[in-house]
Amino acid sequence: MDRRIFGLENEYGVTCTFRGQRRLSPDEVARYLFRRVVSWGRSSNVFLRNGARLYLDVGSHPEYATPECDNVTELVTHDKAGERILEGLLVDAERRLHEEGIAGDVYLFKNNTDSAGNSYGCHENYLVARHGEFSRLADILIPFLVTRQLLCGAGKVLQTPRGAVYCVSQRAEHIWEGVSSATTRSRPIINTRDEPHADAERYRRLHVIVGDSNMSETTMLLKVGATDLVLRMIEAGTVMRDLTLENPIRAIREVSHDITGRRKVRLASGREASALEVQREYYEKAVDFVERRGIRTGTVEQVLELWGRTLDAIEAEDLDRIGTEIDWVMKYKLIERYRAKHNMTMSHPRVAQIDLAYHDIHRRRGLYYLLERKGQATRICNDLKIFEGKSVPPQTTRARLRGDFIRRAQEQRRDFTVDWVHLKLNDQAQRTVLCKDPFRSVDDRVEKLIAGM
């Protein structure tokens, strides 16, 4: 599939610190956060003018699902626009708390674990063709996804009985199955719940829930871009070496606990391979595939260059070569500089604070944004485009139809209901349009519905 629909869903961690007054529960903090949303949307589960969905997920986690995008750079821009929308809600919630005499600071973290050991996710969505064996797709993808954390982990200081260790991935400790239909209880690598949000005879939605949430724009580009290339190879029938893992769940933890990428994991064939070797296999296949197909576009070029350079840098133990582009490396360097300056062990509480503060989405507080201001975080997005993305949907996918419908209905003060595939005016006629094709950004039926308001 040379043109694919992508979507990202990020759940955010919420906390609030209070200066000497009563503490609010996470539920109460979430209510303050969503008060503005509920006041106009009459719900804490809404679709926005940019085509995205914003809602309060299980356990008081705000979740932002990007609109459908058909290119990876636009997807990253819309994910960042979601961050900005939530940052706006955070500032508004703090103001309301202060007006009510509660001196508190609200924090939203784009990470995947809290101090109590709970995990919340970043879910990636890839539209794939319905024909073809899903089990073959999963078999080839799982070794790639287990070792992909070397490219796009967010990094974590893990407290163990033997002291704290720095790991590549936050999510790795919380994955318990390879393929399953659950998302919370057993947490698989690939979720098989079949909700394509599209024509079910033609498409299915690959739902990957193993990845970390990313602060870095370049890490996000690499995560989704490399996965897209692997999917394209599978769809084209590219012959791949059998890299099936003997125990993917053990392997994912082993890979996460080794920042050198050299630790061997057992394959089902009885052989052993390191995460670097597994990734190198997929990378070299991808380079060959792109050359043969003549699809070296700007984005594909960017993805392949960073993918190869990341593997080279880890192999050479020269992390400075990717020190402004890969989340886990950026955070690791930040922590190591701080530890060296203050002569601290990895177990020191200040180190845990840095680990968390990297993911603070408040641009004046968060450590990722401090790096960005200092020119130590490479960017691919444009701030103006991110700002536009808060209210303007992608123009080449179904998100445009949804966004335009919502905008018009709100301007005309009409009551409406939408989801990923339905647009409905709640009037006497109950007019509804079903939009099954996520690639379609122009539709006469929707234009008629909008014109009739």
Swiss-Prot record:
ATP binds at residues 53, 66, 420. GO terms for molecular function: ATP binding; ligase activity, forming carbon-nitrogen bonds; magnesium ion binding; ubiquitin-like protein transferase activity. NCBIfam families: pupylate_PafA. This is Pup--protein ligase. Mg(2+) binds at residues 9, 55, 63. Pfam families: Pup_ligase. Its EC number is 6.3.1.19. PANTHER family: PUP DEAMIDASE/DEPUPYLASE, PUP--PROTEIN LIGASE. InterPro entries: Pup_ligase, Pup_ligase/deamidase. The active site is at 57 (proton acceptor).
